[in-house]
Amino acid sequence: MGDHPIYVTDYRRPHNSPGDDILAAEMHEIARSGATLCDVQGDMFEPHPEQVCMGKEAIYKQMKYIESLKNAGAEVLMSSHLTKFAPAEEIIRIANEHIKRGADVVKIVSISATEEQLYENIRINGILKHEIDHPYLFLSGGAFSHLHRRIGFALGSCMCLCSVIDDEYRVKMQPELSKMKEIVKNFN
């Protein structure tokens, strides 16, 4: 893999999830094995529907966990997958929480269920560029998320999430890598 980054996730599973302590141990092993960017959920150690925990004990545990991943040689992306559309103020608040906990990269997924929400999420992407001095990935899910996922890099997001092939297992809203490369090339 040479100098290419390796971004890994180990999220809770919908059924029979092993628990956050086991997921943390798995991710730590992945970091020690050479992953360069480890995804830590924003509600690790205190599950919350919006993936942002605020309990002092859970936040302390997250900070220690993030420190251990960094000591293992990885950078940390903290992610919050919201189940609703969120206004700019809430997105900025969550981003600042991720930064306070030690994340190297902030990842927030909002919802674009309507065209108006899509336009607002695109606007928020630009606001984040000026409001936080930190690498971030802000994108959206939902019926109107496709455009946001394809142009977010041009609005300040530090990366794009893509699928390698278009098959039944891929996340449908993520663009195919070969198509995304063309978009990036034509943007420049």
What spans do the regions from the language model cover?
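Chitinase-like catalytic core of GlcNAc-active glycosidases
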Residues: 1-19, 66-81
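Flexible, charged surface loops at secondary-structure boundaries
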Residues: 1-2, 30-32, 99-100, 131-132
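Glycine/small-residue-rich loop that forms an oxyanion/phosphate-binding "nest" at active or ligand-binding sites
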Residues: 5-55
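Catalytic alpha/beta core domains of metabolic enzymes, predominantly
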Residues: 42-188
